[in-house]
Amino acid sequence: AFINVYGYNTVLGMSDDELSLNIVKCWNEFVMLTEKQSVGLVMDPLAAEERKGRNIFSYFMPSSAKKFTVAFLYPKSPDTSDWIYAHDLGRNYLEETFPDQMKTICVNDVTEERTEQVLNDVIRQGADIIFEVAPQMMKDSLKVAVDHPDVKILNCSLNTSHKYIRTYYARMYEAKFLSGMIAGALAENDRIAYIADYPIYGMIANINAFALGASFTNPRARIYLAWSTSENYDRERFLKDNNIQVVSDQDMITPRDPGRQFGLYECSEDGRKLNLVMPLWNWGVFYEKMIQSILAGSYQSEENSEGRALNYWWGMSAGVIDLICSKNVPTGVKRLVDHLKSDIKKGDIVPFYGEIRAQDGTLKNKKDKAMKPEAIMEMDWLTDNVIGEIPTMGELRAEARPVVQIKGVEEKMK
């Protein structure tokens, strides 16, 4: 763990005093890795007393105090990536919500090689909290986190065991389940396309939840899976070869390419695309509640006695995931989806419930049982109504591999 934090060459150059000091700094990381403890999942925000009544910042910051600084590190720019664009909308939401109490800074095009330098730069600029929106930044963040324990660094990824960096994600599979229900109801030939990007933790749950939702409204539905990051990906050929009209594509538009190929849509014979549903990552709500949690002390109190790494995995109940239906969705289908969305928010139903089988027929979940969150997070298999497979590293384009090397589904990436 020590060499992982500081690097082999740096460790060789340390004096005895520096070695002793730095070993103490990263001791908790060493203990966590040697004991192979599981990730502690935080499924919903903790309710804070201070949120009731006065603005929470008034409890901690007098009017004369300097602004709280929150930094965002992006691997690309918002105008070229729908993922970064969604997070940047969240950053803007923070500034609009708390204009007098905090400010944000963002850095675009942060490569893995530049991560440590950029982190130190934003800390020198006064960053109190840092959100990294890509898993490939994790490795080079660990040393900075150990050296600056007063700065809170969070990385947007799932299933990562580090003491000094917490991770966060959102339960998009809840919205995908509902989107799948709509797709199943509208697919006249029972064929539905699901276009995924990276085979990483969380993505497989999204695919499987969509497939289960489709079978809920159409037991004959089959989900044809394609990967946009694979070497031979060709969307139009894939849809034509498989005679597919109903498609689940990327979740959002990007400013540079504001087309209609996002969310769930239907392709007409004349080539037009009829938008049906848009799953929504509401990162503004997530960032607002996370900062409130930190300032209210909940963030610190979540450090449990077991010392496990913490991963925030919030969903519809927290308001960080939603589903927007267009007027093109039939009224009866929309009414059913709205009812089930309300039930998911209340926790009355969960997408992964009852008997679930993988493509090879293996029983993955028993009848009358809800699947445990850890099992959902670590999925490395596809449900029996999915046609396609999880790609290997060699089948991916070169630019996609760094992300997958860090957070790829392990069974296929070995």
Enumerate the predicted regions with their spans.
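Periplasmic-binding protein-like
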Residues: 126-135, 154-156, 243-253, 273-281, ...
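Extracytoplasmic "Venus flytrap"
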Residues: 69-90, 94-98, 105-112, 135, ...
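Flexible loop/hinge segments that line or gate small-molecule binding clefts
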Residues: 146-169
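Hydrophobic alpha-helical segments within soluble ligand-binding/sensing domains
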Residues: 169-190, 281-300
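An alpha-beta-alpha
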Residues: 91, 178-221, 225, 305-328
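Structural motif
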Residues: 103-122, 228-240
